[in-house]
Regions:
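Active-site bordering "gate/hinge" segments
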Residues: 1-224, 325, 336-379
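Active-site and channel-lining beta-strand-loop segments
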Residues: 225-240, 321
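Generic beta-strand/beta-sheet core signal
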Residues: 29-31, 207, 232, 239, ...
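Short, isolated positions in well-ordered beta-strands
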Residues: 161-162, 237, 328-330
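Internal helix-turn-beta structural module
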Residues: 281-284, 288-363
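Dual-mode signal for accessory low-complexity, basic/Gly-rich regions
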Residues: 222-223, 239-302, 351-363
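Structured core elements
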Residues: 163, 203-205, 228-230, 238, ...
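Short linear motifs in exposed loops
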Residues: 165, 240, 331-333
Length: 379
């Protein structure tokens, strides 16, 4: 698995995202499905002569993880050095409360936390092979227009034709850039801005992939079997695909309470994501273009007024948007990043729990509940 492309991409991540220093202390937590990735990162850190400990964990439920993790965590010396936490999981996002309880004894300014879901070679060779500063400028440019918008019209080459209403006074935006902030957890892969749309009407054609907060071995690619969804007032009223397996899958998803509601309007901004992956993956969601998340929303509790145990992202390939009455359109795949500062009126606090000791999680999908990811088997 460890070829030149992956090796170089891991080093790029450690340099451009983590900004490693010789006196840093790195601890890697990983689930068995991400053992090879964790091992490759560990090997790179060893070559760089960076102190590193590795601790495995069972996904979701592990009664002995807290004790193992406590033994792996170092005592930071006075006068320098950071604690860098890297977690790698394929389908899950585990043990938030336990991890943050352990980390609460460390000074926030000396703590960096990067949590990767969809861990696989492509996480590094594709999604993390673009500098976070570049993603930051793409996000900044879009948010500069969208956060003052009331209406957005969206079209794609695949046939999407949507009219969307925004309520930026009520609904917050999430911006996943891959940039670390004090007291925040960075979710990887990076590259998305998202909010809750006040209203969505029209036709949406998902012709790239889907992503689900569930364990599934389904082929998530939709390039050769697109899905057409008809939306009225933010709810799916009809959907079609020539692929019977896709329709069966959607039937299983949409039968759940509130699963037909649009809970997220998202725009992917990672231009190193090109072809969709077979696996259920957040990497697909970062594809430049538009996606709609059905079911669970990405807003703080109580803002929207409903909950759903499922979040299904349907992802289109590319897209063009028109904002309010501005004649200039924005091609989501190729727009030029503008020299604007990233807004400070965004959130990475989709789900807040006082048990997390004020360390917040960037969660564009809003699928994390009480520090754990809720999962279902859908096949």
């Amino acid at each position: 698995m460890l070829n030149d492309s992956l090796w170089n991409s891991i080093h790029f991540f450690l340099e451009k995202y983590v900004h490693l220093k010789k006196n840093d202390n790195v601890v890697i937590f990983y689930t068995p499905d991400s053992r090879d990735i964790a091992g490759a990162v560990k090997f790179a850190l060893t070559q760089l002569e960076i102190s590193c400990e590795v601790c495995w964990m069972k996904p979701i439920k592990d009664d002995f993880f807290f004790d193992r993790a406590r033994k792996a965590l170092p005592v930071l010396p006075d006068g320098g050095g950071r604690l860098v936490i890297l977690t790698f999981e394929k389908d899950t996002f585990s043990h938030d409360r336990k991890i943050y309880k352990l980390l609460s004894v460390y000074p926030p300014e000396r703590l960096l936390i990067y949590r990767a879901i969809s861990s696989c070679p492509e996480l590094f060779t594709n999604a993390l092979s673009i500098a976070p500063e570049e993603i930051n400028q793409f996000n900044s440019t879009l948010l500069n227009y969208l956060m003052s918008a009331k209406k957005v019209h969206i079209k794609t080459k695949g046939g999407t034709n949507l009219n969307i209403e925004l309520n930026n006074e009520k609904h917050s935006w999430v911006s996943n850039r891959g940039l670390a902030r004090v007291g925040r957890t960075v979710i990887l892969p990076p590259g998305e801005v998202a909010t809750y749309p006040a209203n969505v009407t029209g036709i949406f054609v998902a012709d790239f992939a889907f992503n689900l907060n569930a364990i599934t071995d389904q082929d998530t690619r939709l390039q050769d079997r697109p899905v057409t969804l008809y939306l009225d007032k933010g709810i799916v009223v009809e959907y079609h695909s020539k692929c019977k397996d896709v329709i069966k899958f959607l039937d299983q998803c949409f039968e759940r309470l509130n699963a037909k509601k649009v809970g997220e309007l998202g725009f992917g901004t990672n231009r190193n994501v090109h072809a969709p992956l077979y696996m259920n993956s957040h990497i697909n969601e970062r594809k430049p273009g538009v996606h709609l998340g059905f079911g669970q929303h990405n807003q703080p509790p109580g803002v929207v007024g409903y909950q759903c145990e499922l979040h299904l992202d349907m992802i289109a390939d590319g897209g063009t948007i028109w904002i309010d009455d501005i004649p200039k359109s924005i091609d989501l795949s190729s727009f030029l990043a503008e020299d604007v500062l990233h807004t400070d009126r965004f959130t990475d606090e989709d789900v807040f729990s006082p048990e997390l000791d004020d360390i917040s999680v960037e969660d564009c999908c809003g699928v994390y509940s009480q520090g754990e990811m809720k999962l279902f088997n859908i096949n």
